[in-house]
Amino acid sequence: MTKVLCKKYNEELDAIPFQPLPGELGKKIHSEISNKAWQAWLAHQTILINEYRLNLIEPKAKEFLKEEMQKFLFENKEDKPEQFNEI
């Protein structure tokens, strides 16, 4: 499997096997983010969608998730909702 120097974990890990999003952002994620980090983002994204009850049809919700994704993957910021408690 192809390796990538992951920006989130700052180590060489398995790359995402496909470009996860279209466009320049998708290319950047594919070349700089590991599959491990992408899977962690998908889990975090699920928390955000559920806790904030996001409607993904709304452009505002999509933009919010895009901003959170960039913070999570490239700035290593993982903001969870105030009321969220892990089980």
From Swiss-Prot:
Highest taxon in the source lineage: Bacteria
Annotated keywords: Iron
Biological process according to GO: cellular response to oxidative stress
GO cellular component terms, A-Z: cytosol
A GO term for molecular function: iron ion binding
Gene3D superfamilies xrefs: Fe(II) trafficking protein YggX
Family, per entry: Belongs to the Fe(2+)-trafficking protein family.
Stated role: Could be a mediator in iron transactions between iron acquisition and iron-requiring processes, such as synthesis and/or repair of Fe-S clusters in biosynthetic enzymes.
Protein name, per record: Probable Fe(2+)-trafficking protein
Organism of origin: Francisella philomiragia subsp. philomiragia (strain ATCC 25017 / CCUG 19701 / FSC 153 / O#319-036)
Higher taxonomy: Bacteria, Pseudomonadati, Pseudomonadota, Gammaproteobacteria, Thiotrichales
